[in-house]
Amino acid sequence: MTQDEASAFCEWLSAMTGHYYRLPTEAEWEYACRAHRESEYHFDKTESIDVFAWHRFTSNGSAHMVKGKKPNRWKLYDMLGNVAEWTIDDYATRGYDDHNTKNPKILLEADAPAVIRGGSWKKHPSALRCGAREAMDPRWEEYDQPQERERHSESVGFRVVRPYLMPVTEQERVSFWSHRSPEQ
């Protein structure tokens, strides 16, 4: 699953339902993952990550069906582990340190890698934290033929958001599903 394929699904879902859906920004993803907690994890220190996340030591080497582990406090499943998740943002090394922190969406140059969040079943449990972030592997976007499985990642997926504010102008509608602005 590439970021472009995930965005295309959001656009298709929007057309089918008449409601707008898109990939979350990094900030939206982290807010949903933390579920009003300030700690590294969305669960108490007395609980084991094993009951919340599929990771290197619990996954048996593959992703699993959603809801196989406990959800966070907002009943969102698999926010950590199982598959990492696409966001609409570009990867900035310092995250939001150099960018707007109110309703942020980080867009850099056209060839900037996108951000994935949440970690996957391949990761060590210590890497599965609410604030952990990674840049995508460029090979995931460079496939020529769909059968080239090594060009896709079996450990990256996506979840959708249905934002409260809908796109109004034509420019907003054009850029709604893409991590690129129409000028790029």
Model-assigned labels for residue ranges:
Residues 34, 43, 54:
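Phosphate-coordinating loops and pocket residues in cytosolic domains that bind phosphorylated ligands
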